[in-house]
Amino acid sequence: TSLYSSNYYVLNSDFRVCICLKNGTSPENPDGKPSLDEPTFTDLEPKSAGTSGDGYLWKYLYTIKPSELIKFDSTEFMPVPSDWATGSDNSSVRDNAVDGGIKVVVIQNRGVGLGTANRTYTRVPIKGDGSGAECTVVVNADQQIGSVDVTNQGSNYTFGTVDIVAGGLPRPDSYPQL
């Protein structure tokens, strides 16, 4: 199902809670794909789990003690550690949080006739109600968007759109949906 209408928090076998930021969604797989790898890392920045190439991107949020999990866990809710706001165990995650930062750009339509084939465009701005977000756009051999990676998450966004023309790509024959 669509990432937007799904539950997307997971508790792994080490009691680490992660949020799914990308579920393998692409123009070819608009509803995503099954996850094949368990996210087990505690890195502060989002990353893929494992080596399957399932297209998932995970962000580690926190680790919860089994004793706290047992009290409040359900299929509808995921408990947060009781000392989340003050405890040192999760301070690095709290300190790394950016209100309204953009972590992922979803490609819904790759477009047609975009720029130069096999070229990478850097510092492409993400316009919206926040500021500072940028991404790198890779145009594939078919002159379509091959990938988009956020390189600066910016802050204070509630929505954003990749501005490919301001990023140096010439006006395409058909605009992509990002």
Region locations from a protein language model:
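Extended assembly-interface regions of large multimeric machines
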Residues: 1-28, 34-80
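Conserved, function-critical positions that sit in or immediately flank catalytic
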Residues: 54-178
